[in-house]
């Protein structure tokens, strides 16, 4: 594995921000644009999905009934491996219930394989590893 140039690193960071924004703003078209058509996503005990459409549909069904959510993606490392780029990023997600009261906070990391397409970088494979989850009680 080798380092990537600044432009590639920034493009990958922008992709991950679009992913988080797509979920948090319930912009399912934006979220879908982050994945290849044949993307494989493994979120551990949460589930696994094949294809950008399936991933997006699951996220829509999971998040539409809820209140606000905030996905923060940090500590990004990016390296090159042949024609693909690999990235690891930390995620800290807060998801609130429909009344923005009780919710959950989950922390973990994404291990991604990304490919360059005609319209920019996309996630081709993702593995989410949850490190911690806790219930958030209303104030």
Predicted regions and their residues:
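Short, low-complexity N-terminal intrinsically disordered segments enriched in polar/charged residues
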Residues: 1-37
């Amino acid at each position: 594995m080798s380092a990537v140039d600044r432009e590639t690193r920034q493009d990958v960071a922008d992709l991950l921000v679009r992913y988080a924004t797509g979920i948090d703003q319930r912009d399912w078209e934006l979220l879908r644009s982050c994945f290849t058509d044949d993307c494989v996503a493994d979120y551990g005990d949460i589930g696994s999905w094949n294809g950008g459409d399936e991933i997006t549909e699951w996220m829509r069904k999971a998040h539409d009934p809820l209140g606000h959510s905030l996905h923060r993606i940090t500590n990004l490392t990016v390296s090159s491996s042949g024609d693909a780029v690999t990235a690891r990023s930390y995620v800290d997600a807060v998801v609130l219930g429909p009344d923005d009261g009780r919710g959950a906070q989950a922390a973990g990391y994404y291990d991604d394989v990304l490919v360059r397409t005609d319209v920019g970088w996309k996630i081709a494979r993702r593995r989410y590893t949850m490190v911690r989850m806790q219930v958030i009680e209303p104030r």
